[in-house]
Regions:
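A short, compositionally biased
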Residues: 29-32, 150-154
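Short strand-turn-strand beta-turns centered on an Asx-Gly dipeptide
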Residues: 159-164
Length: 206
C-alpha cells in the first residue's frame, strides 16, 4: 500500500539536522535513534528520515541519503536556494553522479515483504527485474543495513549486511529506484523532504 504521510514530526527531523554543530561527525534520526555519518565514501549526507507503514506508522527503517561532494559543488550547485523545487529532485534522481540510500532496519523483515514493497512502489516495472533487485536485499533484520548506490552510467549497486551484490546496469531502472524515495510520487512525502533537509546547508555559498 502506497503511503502518503503528512508529517507532524517533520519539524523534529529538521531541527535535529540543522542544530547539529558544524563539527558534528554524525546525524541522528530522532524517531529511531539511528545515527549516520555526515560523510561516507566521498559522499555528503543530505538528510535522514524514517520509513513507516500502515496507519499506525510502524517504523520499518531509518534512511539516509548521500550525494557525491563533487556533484554538490558541480551540477547541483545551480539549485542553491531552490532545494524544494521539482527540478532539484529530478536532478537528484536522474543525475549521473555517485549517490546512495542507506537503510538501517529497525524491525525484522521477510523476503516477501521486501519484494512486495517494491512491487507496490514500482508497479510498472517488470516483476522479474524487481525479483532480482529485491533478492539482493535478502531478509534484513533489526539493526542490519542495506545500501543502494548509483554507480557510473546508472548502475545499481546493492550491499546488504556487508555483502556486495552483482550490479544491475540499467539507467532507467536506477532512476526508478531512486524515484521510490525522491520522485514525483514517492512512497512517503515526509521521508522525501527529510532526505534532503540538509541541502540548504550543504549547498550554501562558500
Amino acid at each position: 500500500m502506497r503511503l502518503r504521510c503528512v508529517a507532524p514530526v517533520a519539524s523534529i527531523v529538521l531541527t535535529a539536522l540543522l542544530t547539529a554543530s558544524a563539527g558534528a561527525q554524525e546525524v541522528k534520526e530522532p524517531r529511531t535513534g539511528v545515527s549516520f555519518p555526515v560523510s561516507r565514501d566521498g559522499m555528503t549526507l543530505l538528510g535522514v528520515g524514517v520509513r513507516t507503514k500502515t496507519f499506525l506508522k510502524v517504523k520499518v527503517y531509518a534512511a539516509a541519503f548521500y550525494v557525491a561532494a563533487s556533484a554538490l559543488a558541480g551540477p547541483l550547485a545551480a539549485h542553491r536556494g531552490h532545494t524544494t523545487a521539482p527540478a532539484f529532485y529530478r536532478d537528484l534522481v536522474w543525475g549521473d553522479f555517485p549517490k546512495a540510500i542507506v537503510m538501517t532496519f529497525v524491525r525484522d523483515t521477510t523476503a516477501s515483504q521486501i519484494r512486495d514493497a517494491f512491487y507496490e512502489a514500482l508497479p510498472t516495472i517488470d516483476h522479474a527485474r524487481l525479483d532480482l533487485f529485491s533478492s539482493h536485499f535478502g531478509t534484513p533484520q533489526k539493526g542490519q543495513t542495506v545500501v543502494v548506490r548509483w554507480g557510473p552510467g546508472g548502475v545499481i549497486e546493492t550491499t546488504s549486511v556487508g555483502n556486495v551484490k552483482p550490479p544491475i546496469a540499467d539507467k532507467a531502472f536506477a532512476g526508478a529506484v531512486f524515484g521510490i524515495w525522491l520522485g514525483e510520487k514517492p512512497i512517503q512525502e515526509d521521508l522525501k523532504r527529510d532526505l534532503v533537509a540538509r541541502a540548504p546547508e550543504v549547498l550554501r555559498s562558500p
